[in-house]
Amino acid sequence: MKKIQFLKVGDYMKTITRTKYLDRIIELNGTPDIKIITGIRRSGKSKLMQAYIEYLKSNFENINIIFIDFMDLAYEEIKEYHALHAYVEEHYQEGKTNYLFVDEVQMCPKFELAINSLYSKGKYDIYVTGSNAFLLSADLATLFTGRYIEIHVFPFSFQEYCQYYDDISDKDKLFDEYAIKGGLAGSYAYRTEKDRTNYIKEVYETIVTRDLVQKYALPDTLVLQRLSEFLMDLSLIHISEPTRHSLI
């Protein structure tokens, strides 16, 4: 029987520094724009925001970080745009550089009214994350009246996959593994292919059958599912042998 090492909750998965994205956010530090971090579910938006917060704490003094995570029940009472606005204003600190971070901002109905009002005051450096299904690039200009910059986060690239496993000894073998496992790093926590596949399937179904259907009130989910499957098959056709090493 194979011996299994049990890990504490929170220790089951390693993290890597996603330098490309972190460097981009650092470049935008202090600019007069709303920084909007978008991407599909489980692509690493929240982890990126947390990494940036840690960077600020380690490199700057006299700062005030206002952090709101709408996935956390502790912030349930401010999932209303007036309450969100009031909460941020209450936590503002005069004489400091005030950073505002709102994770999963779309969970607060009419959030854009609060964010636009806070932006207009000119006293916050604002960062928000949101799912692609609710913060499409085409919608951002309508939602935000002030200047904004979008940072779009993708699942792990092949290069990041190699970095995660700290191995570039056999690129062909690693690419074959990557083609099966994909770039959703949350699936790497599971030991069996079945569990990894179930994780990816659940993320896919949440995006297609819940997020998109809910946003656009689509009556026929079967057509949407078939279309998404066709697009996935089409993308695989374009991953050819010459593509392998160019991805690292």
Regions from the language model: what does each represent?
Residues 2-15, 155, 159-240, 244:
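Interdomain hinge/linker elements that couple catalytic modules in large macromolecular machines
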Residues 16-29:
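Pre-Walker A adenine-sensing motif
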Residues 37:
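Hydrophobic anchor at the beta1->P-loop junction of P-loop NTPases
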Residues 45:
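Conserved lysine of the Walker
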Residues 48:
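Hydrophobic positions on the alpha1 helix immediately C-terminal to the Walker A/P-loop
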Residues 68-95:
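Short glycine-rich substrate-engagement loop in P-loop NTPases that contacts/grips substrate
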Residues 125-131:
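Structural recognition of the conserved hydrophobic beta-strand(s) that form the central parallel beta-sheet
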Residues 134-149:
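Short regulatory helix/loop adjacent to the ATP-binding pocket of P-loop NTPases
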